Swiss-Prot record:
Gene coding for it: atpB1
InterPro entries given in the database record: ATP_syn_F0_a_bact/chloroplast, ATP_synth_F0_asu, ATP_synth_F0_asu_AS, F0_ATP_A_sf
Described function: Key component of the proton channel; it plays a direct role in the translocation of protons across the membrane.
GO molecular function, one term: proton-transporting ATP synthase activity, rotational mechanism
Family recorded in the similarity comment: Belongs to the ATPase A chain family.
Main location: membrane
Source species: Pelobacter propionicus (strain DSM 2379 / NBRC 103807 / OttBd1)
GO cellular component: plasma membrane; proton-transporting ATP synthase complex
Alphabetical keyword list: ATP synthesis, Cell inner membrane, Cell membrane, CF(0), Hydrogen ion transport, Ion transport, Membrane, Transmembrane, Transmembrane helix, Transport
GO biological process, one term: proton motive force-driven plasma membrane ATP synthesis
Protein name per UniProt: ATP synthase subunit a 1
Length: 229
């Protein structure tokens, strides 16, 4: 999908040597923008830490504390080491979703390449964590509880695990791309007031999709940490 009006449209010219599509160039440009915004926001929130937080530091502590509590409630205390991964992916997805509600900005998560990249990171991290925890014994997760059914269960489990990044990719992409298309249509028909309800719904959809992505990330990692039976 090519957005009709973008502030960073000039990036398409800069990325022409890479032979990217216009939609792909838009996704790359706004992905970089979001990474810079997150880095800048984090720097401003932590450059002058105080015992009694205020302003951006207070907001950041609320966000970090909320994500940390969600990880502990979902995975237990042993989930704390995976906070950087879960929080980074979650915040990136959330900001990517929300930025599309600003006219002239494109949500990178409305491009399937961005959602696939996030899903692949989660997929690889899940199995790296599992192998690190269990070593060669991690293969038991794919064999099932009955020895003579192991070959069949292995095949089924492999398909199930490969479907995880696919479902993460398509769920997020489908929701955000669909919402972006509806907004473009509404803005084309009646640019004032009419798109407002869809934009408000977009805020809710953005938070829900980011929450679901984070929750599934935690569930997948938790599953790789458990002992196989």
């Amino acid at each position: 999908m090519v957005h009709p009006l973008l502030f960073l449209e000039f990036f398409r010219k800069l990325l022409e040597p890479l032979h990217m599509s216009e939609a792909g160039a838009d996704a790359v440009a706004y992905t970089w923008l979001i990474m810079l915004l997150l880095l800048l926001f984090s720097f401003l929130a932590t450059r002058a830490l105080k015992m009694i937080p205020c302003g951006l530091q207070n907001f950041m502590e609320v966000v970090v504390g909320g994500v940390e509590n969600m990880i502990v409630e979902t995975m237990g205390e042993h989930g704390r080491p995976y906070f950087p991964l879960v929080a980074t992916v979650g915040l990136f997805v959330l900001v990517s979703n929300l930025i599309g509600l600003i006219p002239g900005f494109f949500p990178p998560t409305a491009n399937i390449n961005t959602t696939a990249a996030c899903a692949i990171v989660v997929f690889i991290a899940t199995h790296v964590v599992g192998i690190k925890r269990h070593g060669i014994g991690y293969i038991k997760h794919f064999c099932g509880p009955i020895l003579w059914l192991a070959p069949v269960m292995f095949f089924i489990e492999v398909i199930g695990h490969l479907s995880r990044p696919l479902s993460l990719t398509l769920r997020l992409f489908g929701n955000m791309n669909g919402h972006e298309l509806v907004l473009i249509i509404f803005f084309g028909l009646a640019p004032f007031l009419v798109p407002l309800p869809m934009m408000l719904m977009g805020v809710l959809v953005s938070f829900i999709q980011a929450f679901v992505f984070m929750l599934l990330t935690m569930i997948y990692i938790q599953g790789s940490l458990e002992e196989a039976h």
